């Protein structure tokens, strides 16, 4: 959506947000019972790649994945047909969310490498038939809000000049907003569950306090306690990504690793035991010389960690969250489920922290999760 799609900038933003939330409550349930569930990640990635190829908006991409989830949930589909289904979902979503000239053409889809490599050729008749089947399955209703439909509205209030970075006033508000959008988009790719949790997770990574201010509570209508569990899982997935990126960088050679702003700390990690979700509110001791007065929410340091010591140049951002729980990286999920990655969060987890990658006061560097 272009100008008319930027509803969060208009006078009716609050009303539209309320209508989307109402529709979200009536979304079809996703049960994850497809016989081809193991192939879901491949086809979700296919949709993401094709979306990026044609520069489709995030709402179109996420709607396409959600349509694919629901359709796979109801039918037993062959692998060859799944290519047709996935691309048809993307076409329907782009027709619903984008302008007409942005919708991919049949010839463009057939020229994609994934199609030519598998000797697959889409025909106009096949696409029309599949689109009709999809529309009938969803009762001709494609107004299915995903987190991508809410994220821009929430980002409009995600960063404010009154926010504190590491307990101090922000030096560069615009760059903070830029990285807030980057992290929100990153977390959005991990989970389609709650856009508000993506914003909160991004604020945690950027060490903004208070973590969930009153304005965001009022804007999203989500309380901090409601978001805690989802935020925790998003951060686990993010830190697994950072760990993998650091591992790949280390394999590239010690010299390239030394040039990186984000490096793995040399000190051994220490196990920290916590219980969910109370660990998000435990006290935190750091090597900071100054502390900001208590605020309405726990600080970012209190949320992300419990008793680890950070090495500071100017200001830092936590990373390297190592857990015994293994995520699968960028797994998109249906709106109705908590997460589509095999992460079972136990009541009590044993977690080792080793956080040291740094972001200075001007945020000039992107964390490893953006380099993959």
Swiss-Prot record:
Q: Does the keyword NAD apply?
A: no
Keyword terms of this UniProt record: Cyclin
GO MF entries: cyclin-dependent protein serine/threonine kinase regulator activity
Gene3D superfamilies from the xrefs?
A: Cyclin-like
In the UniProt record, which is one GO cellular component term? cytoplasm
User: Where does the record place the Cyclin N-terminal domain?
Assistant: 15-143
- A GO BP annotation: G1/S transition of mitotic cell cycle
Mind telling me which residue stretches traverse the membrane in this protein? none
- Keyword DNA damage belongs to the record: no
What Pfam families does the entry give? Answer: Cyclin_C (PF02984), Cyclin_N (PF00134)
Q: Which family does the record assign?
A: Belongs to the cyclin family.
Protein name in the entry: Cyclin-J
Organism whose genome encodes this protein: Homo sapiens
Q: Which gene encodes it?
A: CCNJ
């Amino acid at each position: 959506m272009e100008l008319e799609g930027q509803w969060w900038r208009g006078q009716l933003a609050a009303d539209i947000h309320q209508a989307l939330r109402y529709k979200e409550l009536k979304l079809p349930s996703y049960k994850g019972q497809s016989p081809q569930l193991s192939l879901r990640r491949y086809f979700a990635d296919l949709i993401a790649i094709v979306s990026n190829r044609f520069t489709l908006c995030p709402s179109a991409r996420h709607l396409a994945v959600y349509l694919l989830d629901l359709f796979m949930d109801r039918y037993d589909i062959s692998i060859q047909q799944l290519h047709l289904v996935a691309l048809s979902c993307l076409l329907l979503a782009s027709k619903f969310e984008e302008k007409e000239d942005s919708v991919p053409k049949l010839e463009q889809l057939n020229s994609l490498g994934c199609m030519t490599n598998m000797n697959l050729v889409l025909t106009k008749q096949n696409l029309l038939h599949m689109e009709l089947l999809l529309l009938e399955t969803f009762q001709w209703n494609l107004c299915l809000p995903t987190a991508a439909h809410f994220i821009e509205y929430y980002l409009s209030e995600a960063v404010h000049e009154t926010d504190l970075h590491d307990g101090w006033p922000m030096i560069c508000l615009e760059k903070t907003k830029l990285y807030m959008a980057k992290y929100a988009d990153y977390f959005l790719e991990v989970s389609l569950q709650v856009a508000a949790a993506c914003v909160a997770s991004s604020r945690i990574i950027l060490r903004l306090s208070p973590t969930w201010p009153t304005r965001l509570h009022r804007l999203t209508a989500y309380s901090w306690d409601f978001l805690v569990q989802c935020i925790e899982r998003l951060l686990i997935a993010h830190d697994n990504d950072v760990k993998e990126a650091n591992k790949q960088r280390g394999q590239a050679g010690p010299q390239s690793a030394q040039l990186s702003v984000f490096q793995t700390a040399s000190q051994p990690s220490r196990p920290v035991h916590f219980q969910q979700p109370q660990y998000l509110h435990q006290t935190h001791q750091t090597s900071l010389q100054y502390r900001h007065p208590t605020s309405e929410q726990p600080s970012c340091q209190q949320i992300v960690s419990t008793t680890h010591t950070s090495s500071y140049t100017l200001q830092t951002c936590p990373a390297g969250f190592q857990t015994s729980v293994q995520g699968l990286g960028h797994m998109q999920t249906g709106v109705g489920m908590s997460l589509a990655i095999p992460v079972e969060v136990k009541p009590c987890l044993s977690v080792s922290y080793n956080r040291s990658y740094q972001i200075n006061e001007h945020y000039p560097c992107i964390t490893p999760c953006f380099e993959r």
